[in-house]
């Protein structure tokens, strides 16, 4: 230890390079080392020579095994995560598959029911057609053969009695008339049932075709404005005809209908505005025409009054001056001509008089 009170004052800057010399342990002593791996100076002795090679191999093998174990654990975690994700996907797919299986079963049942109904309706239709043909074209009976049983006694002849004209007709003819009326009523009833059945079959076939066909877009369901002028509108898609329409179909159909109605309203508004403009224009033109007609009628009346009341002898216009040679617009044609003839020839002025300087009166 330096005993100087100010050791740095007398030390140079270059001495700082050797300050570490005083920090060397055991500089002034030589203690016995506590560990065999270190020498007297304190440096580590090469201990690899002392460790046998078997221990070295064992440590290397253990280190490799630990590293492999870590890598395998990492791969195992990744595989477990993948398996978890695949299980989730499999559950969702299973639920969707069950849903679609239920839907297909329902559709198959509906199809079977519809086929059964169609077969029953076809049977009824065929039966109705056969009965209709039988009623319309009955079997023609032999007119010579009588319905009543012929009596075996040929000697007896049934002679009709003479009846009064007021008596009732032949009951056989009345029965025939009643039978024909009954047949006509039955034929009408059968025709009604046939029409109902055919309409029902056609509707069911249209429903099946709509179910098999893809859903049209709402833009295709909207008829353009130019086509609406035609009286025969095209057949629009109506999902309500279906047996079980979905909510999306109904919403699409309603939105398309709303859009079509809005377009029709806008078209009607435009037509109404154009009609109002035409009406206003017509009123204004009629008013102008009436005003012009009234003005023309008033001018004609004024001219007639002036012609009837005009006196050429006593007439004098404001335009009858010495400087006005043109006929006045207010004067009549004769007066204006007379005025022009009077003022046409003027006396010539003397040049000396024109260029002479005027003399004042009070000179």
UniProtKB/Swiss-Prot annotation:
**List of residues that carry Phosphoserine:** 213, 217, 284, 329
Query: Which ranges are annotated Low complexity under compositional bias?
Result: 319-329
> Where are the residues of the annotated region Disordered?
160-184, 310-363
Give coiled-coil spans as residue ranges. 62-136, 248-297
- Gene Ontology CC terms: cytoplasm; nucleus; spindle pole body
Q: Biased composition, Polar residues: where in the chain?
A: 170-182, 349-363
Q: Which Pfam families match?
A: Spc42p
Q: Which key words tag this protein in UniProt?
A: Coiled coil, Cytoplasm, Cytoskeleton, Nucleus, Phosphoprotein
Where is this protein primarily located? nucleus
**UniProt-annotated location(s):** Nucleus; Cytoplasm, Cytoskeleton, Microtubule organizing center, Spindle pole body
Function summary: Forms a polymeric layer at the periphery of the spindle pole body (SPB) central plaque which has an essential function during SPB duplication and may facilitate attachment of the SPB to the nuclear membrane.
Q: Which family does it belong to?
A: Belongs to the SPC42 family.
Subunit structure, interactors included: Component of the SPC110 complex containing at least CMD1, SPC29, SPC42 and SCP110.
Protein's name according to its UniProt entry: Spindle pole body component SPC42
Q: Quote the gene name from the UniProt entry.
A: SPC42
């Amino acid at each position: 230890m330096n005993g100087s009170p100010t050791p740095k004052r007398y030390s140079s800057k270059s001495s700082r390079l050797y300050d570490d010399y005083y920090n060397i342990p055991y500089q002034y002593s030589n203690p016995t080392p506590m560990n065999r791996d270190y020498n007297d100076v304190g440096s580590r002795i090469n201990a690899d020579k002392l460790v046998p090679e078997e221990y070295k191999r064992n440590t290397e093998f253990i280190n490799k095994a630990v590293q492999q174990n870590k890598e395998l654990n990492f791969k195992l975690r990744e595989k477990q995560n993948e398996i978890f994700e695949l299980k989730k996907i499999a559950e969702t797919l299973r639920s969707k598959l069950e849903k679609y299986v239920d839907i297909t079963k329902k559709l198959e049942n509906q199809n079977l029911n519809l086929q059964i109904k169609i077969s029953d309706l076809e049977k009824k239709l065929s039966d109705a057609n056969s009965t209709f043909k039988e009623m319309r074209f009955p079997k023609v009976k032999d007119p010579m053969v009588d319905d009543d049983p012929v009596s075996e006694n040929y000697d007896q002849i049934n002679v009709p009695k003479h009846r009064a004209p007021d008596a009732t007709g032949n009951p056989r003819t009345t029965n025939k008339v009643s039978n024909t009326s009954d047949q006509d009523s039955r034929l009408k009833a059968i025709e009604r049932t046939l029409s109902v059945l055919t309409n029902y079959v056609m509707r069911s076939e249209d429903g099946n075709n709509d179910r098999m066909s893809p859903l049209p877009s709402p833009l295709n369901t909207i008829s353009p404005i130019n086509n609406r002028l035609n009286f025969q509108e095209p057949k629009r898609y109506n999902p309500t005809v279906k047996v079980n329409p979905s909510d999306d179909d109904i919403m699409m159909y309603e939105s398309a209908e709303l859009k079509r109605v809005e377009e029709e309203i806008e078209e009607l508004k435009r037509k109404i505005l154009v009609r109002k403009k035409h009406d206003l224009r017509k009123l204004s033109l009629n008013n102008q025409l009436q005003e012009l007609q009234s003005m023309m009628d008033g001018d004609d009346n004024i001219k007639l009054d002036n012609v009837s009341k005009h006196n050429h002898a006593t007439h004098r216009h404001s335009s009858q001056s010495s400087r006005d040679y043109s006929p006045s617009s207010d004067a009549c044609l004769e007066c204006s001509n007379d005025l022009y003839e009077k003022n046409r020839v003027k006396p010539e002025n003397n040049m000396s008089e024109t260029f002479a300087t005027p003399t004042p009166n009070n000179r």
